[in-house]
Structures are given as structure tokens and as C-alpha cells.
From Swiss-Prot:
Pfam families: Hormone_2 (PF00123). The keyword Metal-binding does not apply. This is Glucagon-1. Promotes hydrolysis of glycogen and lipids, and raises the blood sugar level. Keywords: Hormone, Secreted. GO terms for molecular function: glucagon receptor binding; hormone activity. The lineage of its organism: Eukaryota, Metazoa, Chordata, Craniata, Vertebrata. PANTHER family: GLUCAGON (PTHR11418), PRO-GLUCAGON (PTHR11418:SF0). Belongs to the glucagon family. Coiled coil: none annotated. X's in the sequence were included by homology with American goosefish sequences. Gln-14 is a unique substitution from leucine in other known glucagon sequences and glucagon-like peptides. It is found in: Secreted. One of its GO terms (cellular component) is extracellular region.
Length: 68
């Protein structure tokens, strides 16, 4: 019935939001600890940021797929 559909949609929204918050928290905590200084540090940092962003997107997609 309609109440169940709303509850299910809301639960999915909450799960997605929690996953996004978790990934954001991971990215924020990892960013503070990744301060390595070397000649190609900027390039390495940009690649690391890209890979972290991609991993976060993949993780959220995996959570949304319901295979957890």
C-alpha cells in the first residue's frame, strides 16, 4: 500500500544519505593525513584525490545496488 512505498523510499533515501555522509567523512579524514611533500606532490595529490572520489562513487553505487 502507499504507506509502505513511502517508508521504503524514505529508507532508501536515508541509506543513501548515510553512505554519502560516511564517504565524505572518510575523504575528509584521509585528506588531513595525506600531506606528503615531494617534487611531484601536486600531481600525486590530484591523482589520489581523483582515485578517492572514484572509489567513493563506486562504493555509494555498490551500496545503492543493495548487494551489501
Amino acid at each position: 500500500h502507499s504507506e509502505g512505498t513511502f517508508s521504503n523510499d524514505y529508507s532508501k533515501y536515508q541509506e543513501e544519505r548515510m553512505a554519502q555522509d560516511f564517504v565524505q567523512w572518510l575523504m575528509n579524514s584521509x585528506x588531513x593525513x595525506x600531506x606528503x611533500x615531494h617534487a611531484d606532490g601536486t600531481y600525486t595529490s590530484n591523482v589520489s584525490t581523483y582515485l578517492q572520489d572514484q572509489a567513493a562513487k563506486d562504493f555509494v553505487s555498490w551500496l545503492k545496488s543493495g548487494r551489501a
